[in-house]
């Protein structure tokens, strides 16, 4: 009885080990067994859902970030400078017509000339592109513009009407012509000009020519005062060579000569 019982135990042990070994071979690699999968099915589903939510949240964050970057880019384009800050020159434009006038821009949009320079005649000329400049009144904070009818006025915003072509003449004066407005059939340019009374001329007038002094302006810009360069030169003093020291000779007492001669004065009267 004991031997048969032991044989049964041994056979059952072999059968159980073979069955367990077969299950291990049947299960594919990288997948948990039935015990592992059956332990917490809810946990697996929750992990999958959490992964899905994290991926969706990351995609939403990336999309919102890209949208914010796009909004920032458009905002930067909208908030960019309306005129180029390069090549700024601050001063006045002097026209030598009549008694001489300084071009000035008023806050209410009026443009004319004044014989005496004042705060309204302080202008800022800045470069827009090659050969194209803009003129802004420092006090009025408005831009010089020319309408499609050739009238000079001041504009609060910098537009294409505010662009002028700057040319240097042979007499060291400058002319300023509208960059977009001109006489279409002949292609004649419209220039900024003042008359003898200091009033602004229409650029479309046939009398406004680049050869006339009414279109010639002399830029008067403030030049920075150069600091005075001063320096001191120290010349080394030449030291006099020391005089040779004379040897001290002991002074001897004067000796009285033994043969002394005395003379007596004799006075003779009469």
UniProtKB/Swiss-Prot annotation:
Glycans are attached at residue 112. Residues 69-83 have a biased composition (Polar residues). It is found in: Secreted. InterPro entries: Fibroblast_GF_fam (IPR002209), IL1/FGF (IPR008996). Residues 26-83, 236-257 are annotated as: Disordered. GO terms for biological process: fibroblast growth factor receptor signaling pathway; neurogenesis; positive regulation of cell division; positive regulation of cell population proliferation; positive regulation of MAPK cascade; regulation of cell migration. One of its GO terms (cellular component) is cytoplasm. Residues 1-20 form the signal peptide. Residues 43-68 have a biased composition (Low complexity). One of its GO terms (molecular function) is growth factor activity. Keywords: Glycoprotein, Growth factor, Mitogen, Secreted, Signal. Its main location: secreted. It holds the Pfam family FGF. It comes from the Eukaryota. Interacts with FGFR1 and FGFR2. Affinity between fibroblast growth factors (FGFs) and their receptors is increased by heparan sulfate glycosaminoglycans that function as coreceptors. Plays an important role in the regulation of cell proliferation and cell differentiation. Required for normal regulation of the hair growth cycle. Functions as an inhibitor of hair elongation by promoting progression from anagen, the growth phase of the hair follicle, into catagen the apoptosis-induced regression phase. Belongs to the heparin-binding growth factors family. This is Fibroblast growth factor 5.
């Amino acid at each position: 009885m004991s031997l048969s019982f032991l044989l049964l135990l041994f056979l059952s042990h072999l059968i159980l080990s073979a069955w367990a070994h077969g299950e291990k071979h049947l299960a594919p690699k990288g997948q948990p067994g039935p015990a592992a999968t059956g332990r917490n099915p809810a946990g697996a589903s929750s992990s999958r859902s959490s992964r899905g939510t994290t991926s969706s949240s990351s995609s939403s964050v990336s999309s919102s970030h890209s949208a914010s970057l796009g909004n920032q880019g458009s905002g930067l384009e909208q908030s960019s400078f309306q005129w180029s800050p390069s090549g700024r020159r601050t001063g006045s434009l002097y026209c030598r017509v009549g008694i001489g006038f300084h071009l000035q821009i008023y806050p209410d949009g009026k443009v004319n000339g004044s014989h005496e320079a004042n705060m309204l005649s302080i202008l800022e000329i800045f470069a827009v592109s090659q050969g194209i400049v803009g003129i802004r009144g420092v006090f009025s904070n408005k831009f010089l513009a020319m309408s499609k009818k050739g009238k000079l006025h001041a504009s609060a915003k910098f537009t294409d009407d505010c662009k002028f072509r700057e040319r240097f003449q042979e007499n060291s004066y400058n002319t300023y012509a509208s960059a977009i407005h001109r006489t279409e059939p002949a292609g004649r340019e419209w220039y900024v000009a003042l008359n003898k009374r200091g009033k602004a001329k229409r650029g479309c007038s046939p009398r406004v020519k680049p050869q006339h002094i009414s279109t010639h302006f002399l830029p008067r810009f403030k030049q920075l005062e150069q600091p005075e360069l001063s320096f001191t030169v120290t010349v080394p003093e030449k030291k006099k060579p020391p005089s040779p020291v004379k040897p001290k000779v002991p002074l001897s007492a004067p000796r009285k000569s033994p043969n002394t001669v005395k003379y007596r004065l004799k006075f003779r009267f009469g």
